């Protein structure tokens, strides 16, 4: 080979070696970079997994730690051996599978635990009830047993704390028999008692309570209830009513709470009633609400206090008007009202005719309140309570349509004197509606309506709310309201206000929250106020020792006996737990023993003779019996209670079902002030209408007699022919 060929071969070998060395260097560099990338990727995934698995269980966390330790050990082995090992990273799918397995294990463990606890569900419910009871107890003890400092600032007697109740003698209470004008009650105290009355119209709707009782009830179901007819009507009548709705604007609306009021069709938003589809649309209401003037209030107070000086009464009226607004309901169209009232009077009093009365409210006067209430009572006695509720709601609608826009029932914003006839109809409609609500099971709504009824005249209390309000609040488990009210002057100013039922309701409320000492003190206070009734209750309901009740006979005390009968009619519904009845029996035995030892004193004037009560000319008593107790007893329609009413009450007084024991004039001047049904009847027109009805009846009797004679004659002829 030539030298040139040798040099070329050497250059080629050198080039080959250089290329080989470069390739090896690149391999080493790429291997290092790959290992670094793998290490970096592993760190990123571990960070992501730490964030994602932070909410997982501790078992999963331990598993991930073990994986990391195994990976670290593998890296150490690789470095020690010098031989690369393949690193396998956990993928997302594998981790999800691990999580699903862990969750399945956890669910299975939870299901097994639930099965084990299935037998202890009743115990858990009892513990939950105990927690609720403890919460109520702490809440009541925090707010319910505080004194009303505002009333004490007025220098007015208020009920003491339960611990001091035993030191308060009954004679510290005043009597309404000698104070018919409530002059000893500072009217400014009502400002601090507004919490005991109603200021939320939503609570007056039964649907509010239905939503609380059945949380899964749908708005569509409630809408269907609102769209239902309140009384049975034919499809033809419904079509006619729908045509009338198109002619009268603002009738019903989407929420069934709009009603036109006046010739301008101005819409009135209803507060506590809803328009039903079978109610006949009208352009304006039947009643209006009038604010009473100072002269009206003076006439009213002169009726209540016929023996007081007029100047003193005027001063009291001016003080009242600073805090309270007084109203009266009156007919918008007096002529139309007199016509409807005459038809009603003839169909109810002169010539009782149920069919004529039903026809009166069905076609001629569909919004005549006395007729609606009377027909509702007829349906109740016939057992048709479904139609009763619709008629009562229609009667309340008449008053709801007439209410002022800013009215609330807090005892200050709206009071209705009982001497006015249509005011009394509003009282009666609410009372009947409360009974209907209680029968339907909405006790909470019934208790709210009781607040409304009481707020219309909290001092006079014409229908005796103090005799039955405890019943609804106990059934509604509202113990805080009862305990707070027991410290209010509304229950403690006059002895007639601290009723037997409410006194025992305070005892029962303390028992329900396990305040035994307070319950004992409340029972001792009740015995000092009502010794005769509690002694009789001890014998009849608790089957106590008769020897302990000697010298405490209720015989001859009509008022105390009537109040006791009214309470005993509902005693089993309230005292329905054996431990509570046992407590009442044992504590009454102890109190009666202390009474006979002389350690307990009662008022020496208890059950005094009221023969001279008429000399005081009190409009709130009849022979010593509170007139509101009599009204409540009659309206309750409990046979055992009505049997305890003295017979002279029925014979010597006006007891109409639509107007029970209406107020009677106390002087010549008050004859024109006190309204009754005859106030809205024209005597001449009534005489003419009565004569026409008598002629019609005579004619019908003659027709019946002729028909009967003809029938007899035909039967005689047929018998002769057969013979």
From Swiss-Prot:
Keywords: Cytoplasm, Phosphoprotein. Residues 21-125 are annotated as: Disordered. Residues 109-118 have a biased composition (Basic and acidic residues). The modification Phosphothreonine is found at residue 158. The keyword Phosphoprotein applies. GO terms for biological process: rescue of stalled ribosome; ribosome-associated ubiquitin-dependent protein catabolic process. Residues 27-37 have a biased composition (Polar residues). Belongs to the TCF25 family. Component of the ribosome quality control complex (RQC), a ribosome-associated complex that mediates ubiquitination and extraction of incompletely synthesized nascent chains for proteasomal degradation. Within the RQC complex, RQC1 is essential for the recruitment of CDC48 to incompletely synthesized nascent polypeptides that are ubiquitinated by RKR1/LTN1. Component of the ribosome quality control complex (RQC), composed of the E3 ubiquitin ligase RKR1/LTN1, RQC1 and RQC2, as well as CDC48 and its ubiquitin-binding cofactors. RQC forms a stable complex with 60S ribosomal subunits. This is Ribosome quality control complex subunit 1. It comes from Saccharomyces cerevisiae (strain ATCC 204508 / S288c). The lineage of its organism: Eukaryota, Fungi, Dikarya, Ascomycota, Saccharomycotina.
């Amino acid at each position: 080979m030539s030298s040139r060929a040798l040099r070329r071969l050497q250059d080629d070998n050198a080039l080959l070696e250089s290329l080989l060395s470069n390739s090896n260097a690149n391999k080493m560099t790429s291997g290092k970079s790959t290992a670094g990338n793998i290490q970096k990727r592993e760190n990123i995934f571990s960070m992501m997994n730490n964030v994602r698995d932070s909410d997982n269980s501790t078992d999963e966390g331990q598993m991930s730690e073990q994986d990391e330790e195994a990976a670290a050990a593998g890296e150490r082995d690789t470095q020690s051996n010098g031989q690369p090992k393949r690193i396998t990273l956990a993928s997302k799918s594998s981790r999800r599978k691990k999580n699903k397995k862990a969750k399945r294990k956890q669910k299975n463990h939870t299901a097994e635990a639930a099965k084990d606890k299935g037998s202890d569900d009743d115990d858990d419910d009892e513990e939950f009830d105990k927690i609720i009871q403890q919460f109520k107890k702490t809440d009541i003890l925090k707010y319910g047993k505080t004194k009303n400092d505002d009333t004490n600032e007025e220098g007015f007697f208020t009920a003491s704390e339960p611990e001091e109740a035993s030191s308060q003698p009954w004679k510290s209470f005043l009597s309404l028999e000698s104070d018919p004008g409530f002059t000893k009650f500072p009217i400014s105290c009502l400002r601090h008692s507004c919490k005991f009355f109603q200021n939320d119209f939503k609570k007056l709707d039964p649907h509010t309570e239905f939503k609380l009782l059945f949380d899964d009830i749908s708005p569509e179901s409630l809408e269907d209830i609102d769209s239902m007819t309140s009384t049975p009507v034919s499809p033809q009548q419904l079509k006619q009513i729908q045509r009338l709705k198109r002619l009268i604007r603002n009738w019903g609306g989407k929420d069934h709470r709009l009603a036109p009021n006046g010739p301008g069709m101005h819409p009135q938003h209803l507060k506590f009633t809803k328009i039903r589809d079978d109610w006949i649309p009208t352009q304006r209401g039947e009643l209006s609400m009038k604010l009473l003037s100072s002269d009206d209030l003076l006439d009213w107070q002169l009726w209540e206090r016929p023996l007081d000086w007029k100047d003193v009464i005027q001063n009291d009226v001016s003080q009242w008007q600073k805090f309270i607004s007084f109203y009266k309901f009156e007919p918008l169209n007096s002529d139309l009202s007199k016509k409807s009232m005459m038809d009603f009077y003839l169909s109810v009093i002169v010539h009782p005719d149920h069919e004529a009365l039903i026809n009166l409210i069905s076609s001629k006067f569909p919004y005549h309140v006395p007729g609606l209430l009377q027909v509702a009572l007829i349906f109740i006695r016939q057992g048709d309570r479904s139609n009763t509720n619709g008629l009562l709601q229609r009667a309340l609608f008449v008053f709801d349509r007439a209410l002022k826009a800013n009215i609330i029932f807090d005892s200050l914003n709206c009071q209705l004197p009982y001497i006015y006839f249509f005011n009394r109809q509003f009282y009666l409609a609410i009372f009947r509606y409360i009974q209907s609500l209680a029968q339907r099971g909405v006790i909470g709504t019934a208790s709210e309506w009781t607040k409304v009824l009481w707020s219309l005249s909290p001092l006079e209390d014409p229908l005796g709310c103090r005799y039955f309000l405890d019943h609804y609040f106990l059934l509604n488990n509202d113990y805080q309201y009862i305990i707070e009210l027991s410290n209010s002057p509304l229950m403690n100013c006059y002895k007639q206000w601290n009723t037997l039922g409410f006194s025992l309701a305070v005892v029962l409320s303390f028992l329900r929250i396990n305040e035994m000492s307070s319950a004992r003190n409340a029972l001792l206070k009740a015995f000092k106020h009502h010794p005769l009734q509690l002694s009789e209750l001890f014998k009849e309901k608790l089957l106590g020792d008769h020897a302990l009740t000697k010298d405490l006979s209720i015989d001859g005390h009509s008022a105390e006996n009537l109040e006791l009968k009214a309470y005993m009619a509902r005693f089993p519904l309230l005292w329905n737990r054996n431990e509570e009845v046992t407590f009442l029996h044992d504590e009454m035995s102890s109190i009666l023993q202390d009474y006979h030892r002389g350690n307990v004193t009662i008022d020496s004037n208890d059950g005094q003779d009221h023969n001279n009560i008429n000399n005081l000319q009190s409009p709130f008593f009849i022979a010593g019996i509170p007139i509101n107790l009599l009204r409540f007893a009659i309206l309750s329609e409990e046979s055992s209670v009505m049997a305890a009413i003295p017979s002279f009450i029925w014979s010597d007084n006006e007891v109409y079902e639509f107007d029970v024991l209406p107020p009677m004039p106390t002087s010549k001047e008050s004859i024109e002030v006190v309204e009754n049904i005859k106030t809205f009847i024209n005597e001449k027109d009534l005489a003419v209408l009565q004569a026409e009805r008598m002629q019609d009846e005579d004619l019908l009797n003659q027709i019946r007699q002729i028909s009967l004679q003809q029938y007899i004659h035909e039967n005689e002829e047929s018998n002769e022919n057969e013979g």
